Amino acid sequence: GISTAYAKYGAKLIMVDLSPAVEETAEKLRKEYNAEIITVIANVADREQMDAAAAKGVEKFGEINVACCNAGVCRLAPFEEMDDKTRDFHIDVNIKGVWNTCKAVIPYMLKQGGGNIVIASSVTGDIVADAGEAAYAMTKAALVGLTKCLAVEYADRNIRVNCSQLGYARTPMVEKMALESNPENPEAAIADIAVGVPMKRLAKPIEVGELFAFLGSDESSYLTGSQIVIDGGSTLPETMSIGTN
């Protein structure tokens, strides 16, 4: 959704992914939008690989105007059963991955006189919580703090930093979570999620992409350090309340 939105608006893209399948996605965008795209196979948890990815982007396009930090993982497990390896996996991808991306791009942004960073946090951790998601909630809440600190630190140097706080979208990660939750009928798990959303559906990836495109554009030029919730209203209802249907 994010790469599609940026391609639609004419951005030149550096698509970084751990999977070689990213090239297939890139080729579809090239054909549909005539987009200029390079792909880089890299692990966001590896600082050197992210430095190299940013360098390749600058070598190709001359500068980096926007960085979308949207790599993320979620593994479900009761807290007492979650091992340190799983905890560290969340930290490596969800926190260090964003940290490494920011470390890789900010020097270029400073040199060129500014830029935008959009970080994918979540409503989970900072606003709401679910059993079995301790590692995910911890790491996603940390990104809100990182967003605010970077926004303050770089505001006077024309680098804006904002984060999206997504509820549930129909993404591969959510589909994997649904499969873990209900291996026999993952679609039922997704339907159960939608029931709790006032809009009665999950977000479409392109809807999330449009928010990222807005936050990376001059249309949001006075926004920095902001947390933008995109959840179909799922965090609004009270758990216990008296009211009308």
Regions found by a protein language model. Give the residues of each.
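Canonical Rossmann dinucleotide-binding motif of NAD(H)/NADP(H)-dependent dehydrogenases/reductases
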Residues: 1-14
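Substrate-binding pocket helix/loop in short-chain dehydrogenase/reductase
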Residues: 78-79, 83-91, 189, 193
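Active-site loop-to-helix junction immediately N-terminal to the catalytic Tyr of the SDR YXXXK motif
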Residues: 82, 128-137, 149, 177
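Active-site helix of classical SDR
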Residues: 102, 139, 147
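Alpha-helical segment proximal to the catalytic Tyr-Lys
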Residues: 107, 152-156, 221
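C-terminal helical subdomain
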Residues: 163, 185-219, 223, 230-232
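Short C-terminal tail/terminal secondary-structure segment
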Residues: 224-245
